[in-house]
UniProtKB/Swiss-Prot annotation:
Residues 1-367 are annotated as: Interaction with SEC23A. This is SEC23-interacting protein. Interacts with SEC23A. It comes from Homo sapiens. Residues 644-707 form the SAM domain. Residues 133-252, 716-748 are annotated as: Disordered. It is found in: Cytoplasmic vesicle, COPII-coated vesicle membrane; Endoplasmic reticulum. The gene is SEC23IP.
Amino acid sequence: MAERKPNGGSGGASTSSSGTNLLFSSSATEFSFNVPFIPVTQASASPASLLLPGEDSTDVGEEDSFLGQTSIHTSAPQTFSYFSQVSSSSDPFGNIGQSPLTTAATSVGQSGFPKPLTALPFTTGSQDVSNAFSPSISKAQPGAPPSSLMGINSYLPSQPSSLPPSYFGNQPQGIPQPGYNPYRHTPGSSRANPYIAPPQLQQCQTPGPPAHPPPSGPPVQMYQMPPGSLPPVPSSVQSPAQQQVPARPGAPSVQVPSPFLLQNQYEPVQPHWFYCKEVEYKQLWMPFSVFDSLNLEEIYNSVQPDPESVVLGTDGGRYDVYLYDRIRKAAYWEEEPAEVRRCTWFYKGDTDSRFIPYTEEFSEKLEAEYKKAVTTNQWHRRLEFPSGETIVMHNPKVIVQFQPSSVPDEWGTTQDGQTRPRVVKRGIDDNLDEIPDGEMPQVDHLVFVVHGIGPVCDLRFRSIIECVDDFRVVSLKLLRTHFKKSLDDGKVSRVEFLPVHWHSSLGGDATGVDRNIKKITLPSIGRFRHFTNETLLDILFYNSPTYCQTIVEKVGMEINHLHALFMSRNPDFKGGVSVAGHSLGSLILFDILSNQKDLNLSKCPGPLAVANGVVKQLHFQEKQMPEEPKLTLDESYDLVVENKEVLTLQETLEALSLSEYFSTFEKEKIDMESLLMCTVDDLKEMGIPLGPRKKIANFVEHKAAKLKKAASEKKAVAATSTKGQEQSAQKTKDMASLPSESNEPKRKLPVGACVSSVCVNYESFEVGAGQVSVAYNSLDFEPEIFFALGSPIAMFLTIRGVDRIDENYSLPTCKGFFNIYHPLDPVAYRLEPMIVPDLDLKAVLIPHHKGRKRLHLELKESLSRMGSDLKQGFISSLKSAWQTLNEFARAHTSSTQLQEELEKVANQIKEEEEKQVVEAEKVVESPDFSKDEDYLGKVGMLNGGRRIDYVLQEKPIESFNEYLFALQSHLCYWESEDTALLLLKEIYRTMNISPEQPQH
């Protein structure tokens, strides 16, 4: 906006005659039109004063030189062409950015209306908008506002009746009220599609003739130009933009639309809902997904019987939004409530990386001022608010905010960042592509994720909740790329991952261990000791008989609680459930799953048996035995042996996985009775190795104790009176008839409840110092797959004295088991060598999510193959040379010693060659190869006969220094696309759904 001249006045006094165009008078046509014109309101304005010389460019005001308005040679601001072209739609922003259809270029910063009208609303005097545009202007003035509508350059008519009094007030009675409310949609507005395309797209998509006034409105001739008010513009004076006017829909022959139609071109802003989230100790405003925002807006605009109690689930049902209180709460875990806003206006400073929404009250004020500016075409508005902020609306695209000025210090400087304004933005149309579409409400599969040591799960010190959020986002992206066809067909929806947090059960006032450890911790290297107490001590806690029970109970109860809560919030869920554990969490899950009870495999001797949380009544046997805890992995043979009524030596050895020694016992004429009388020395003399010898000795000791216990019980029963036996038999008969007499449904155990309680102590065995005896809770479901990420299960089993896992062993209630690890992970260990120690198998290489190996791995294999070929060729040549020497020696000598030496060298060369061939055939297996199927039955039944160990591909930079990336490798699983894709493949494999080729 050009700076006002000292003698400008208000335009009321002028010596020019009415209807005279100062820009296109006879004197004005003599000037060069390469220099833009500025309309002035001086009484003695000479033609020469209409030009803006170069040295006068410094007269441009501060507002004109702001944001996009630089010099007089630049193109005119968007506000000048705002009403200069024919609008092909009702969009007020459709012509922004196009050249104006005026006869002369308007100077930079000059509004489409003259100074008297545009300046009045911005002054601090008593004049306002209604006075500035009142119909009391009875005579055409030299500074009258040029109205360049529809390509016709004219002034507003001088007749008093040309502008109705209700122009800027109420609309004429004949016009139907559109009912627009920028904060509440109506059936007549965009309720069906709240996200309207940007104005530029609307103009391109809906070309056509200009909008005509509705039939019920005032007659169009009310606003037609009076005949002869403007002289015709010569064709030589017309600008290039004007010469193209006849080709456009708005030709000069088209009638000028009513000015009140411009008010109808205002479109209310489309709101979007945001929530405040703390990320790395910073407050960030995150947008809800498009799906969630539409649901929130629909509920917001609807009428609810009890608005204070309206709760809407978002983020796939993991969060609840309390609409009345404007807060967002987590549904499955403890988290600080987050503030929720219905956002329409945003700002961004120099130091901000993203736009920050204004409060809803402040946004309403801005929207009201913006609507006033659009309907009246009055820009460069300076809006001052009581809080001290000043907002200037230069045009629809350039709106800035100035911070309230602070008091300068003794050096005369103010705070940083206050001299530069903030950029203000209306709506989120430009960033709509960056907002996620949202998660589908239907869930195909549920996965519980248990964290490892410490309260943090990655190098950014994030909790398990944030890490699982990242893993969930990665899985959703892979669904759209690798399961696109199934997703489009509706066969696939999504997989839900819920975190299980247990570290808090060790600290706090519940156990008091934090206070005790703090007392004994040395004051030196405080941070390092704090890190050790928070992380590494979890491993020691799990090996403690007291805290191991606490950890196991916490994990079991939390999983059951989350499962019950998920089923209550998703009653239509019919999918499967799996579990995943990272680091120590995988060991906790392995122990829990190893101690689950499967009624299909064993008969529980107690009155109650728990399976999937359902308490079932069982018939009593004649001989009542107290319920015993589930045996650990190294005692799993006892469960098989005890279920056999008649035990033979061969069956016992098979249960102990020692069937290969049956011939040795048979040779010594040892049967089952003789075996129970054998000692360790006897087994040693028979040539039994140490490992099997320990197993047999442990079995003999355990069996002898049980026989002794059974004998004592039999003696006690024999001493009981006949009357007591009859009462016991009657009681047994009554309890056995309960299932047939009771028709009430089976009752559910409370979440985390356990049938029996076992004291925590150590059970000492011959192997090692002893193991922790823990009572494990029964899960309320049977998991389909168990995923172990960076797992130390094999190492813990080894230090417990388990040197081998039986090939026939499997988890009682879980049929799938995948041990996934990074090659540089210092905490991960393999499991397959414990099952098949004699079979040298490399881990299955997990393919890259883009369908190929990493480049450095392919190069490494190529170089390895090339080196092997060169070495093999060299050995072949050497062998040929030695054969030639051998033949030459045979022809010229008969020495047997020389002959033996040559044969010895030839044999060594042959052995080297065979060794190279074997090494060349050893390649890393891939799950896509048929060789994976060749090993069915050879790697045990822990994963249903399939491979167990799966290794990720290392990155090229990680191969340079293994030690540098060791810690990062243990924490890389949360953002690994390869890991997430393997989980999705195996989960949907249970649903007979295979991935397609990656769509990138």
